[in-house]
Amino acid sequence: MKKISLLLAALLVLTVALCACGSDTTSSASSETSSAVSSEVSPEAFSEVSSEVSSEAASEVSSEASTSETAAGGYGEFTTIEEGKLIMATNAQFPPYELVSDGEGFNGTGFEGIDVEIASAIADKLGLELQIDDMDFDSALVAVQNDAADVVLAGLSYSEERDEVLDFTDSYATGVQVVIVKEGSDVTMDNLGEKMIGTQRGTTGYIYASDTPENGGYGEDHVSAYDNGATAVQALVNGQVDAVIIDEAPAKEFVAANEGLTILPGNWVEEKYCAAVNEGNTALQNAINTALNELMDDGTVQEILDKYITAE
């Protein structure tokens, strides 16, 4: 308010001065008025107000131009942790969704898989460079919650527990969890609760299996958690657990790579895969969701899924 008053006073000085130049009869009054106003508005104050108003106006114009440019892309106004980048947290031991590449990986990321290619396509639409940070599954969820990563894609399925700390996108794939056992084992879907089960720590497989029998689980005493699916499967091979609950796509990869393992008939549970951002980051959630839906509508997501998962 003070700045506005000073600016008006400064403009009054100019007006009075111009009037004084155009009329001799008012020159005396104009001189007195100009002197009085000038005593209130020093050159320094006038300069400061003019400078600040110009700066604010320029900033406002710049902001409006930036917003307009972003909105033109159809993704709204959003920010990421590092300007120009989309940082994705994942656990790259979950084939075919994410795995470490032997070479440069997809688009030079060092990684490959369904989630890697989908995230790369999303980043392209948002005009960002994709950076992938590999870590344990639990750590990937925490990284997003602590703003160390923008988004998590890691064969991540929705759960009410996760929804309390993360904001999810729409689902882009269906995940079916199955049970891996040794060939000739007496383990069945019906007697799983009597066996020792291996799971990947932090996954819905672990959450559901370790829940109480009243809630459909087997209890924590019947579940061993491992940092990743590969370690859980190795525990099965070594006889440390009787079965492993894991998603169907990686289960097939692990069974193919380990002789003597098989998948029990039937599905243990079916769920949807999503991406997720930190709770409350609605702008980024909407931007990613919009890009993701465009990729589903134009068939890109299905092409990526078909590339890695062959229908039987």
Predicted feature residues:
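Bilobed "Venus flytrap"/periplasmic-binding protein-like clamshell domains
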Residues: 88, 94-95, 109-124, 156, ...
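Extracytoplasmic small-molecule ligand-binding "clamshell" domains
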Residues: 71-155
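Short helix-initiation/N-cap motifs at beta->coil->alpha
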Residues: 114-116, 131-144, 184, 223-238, ...
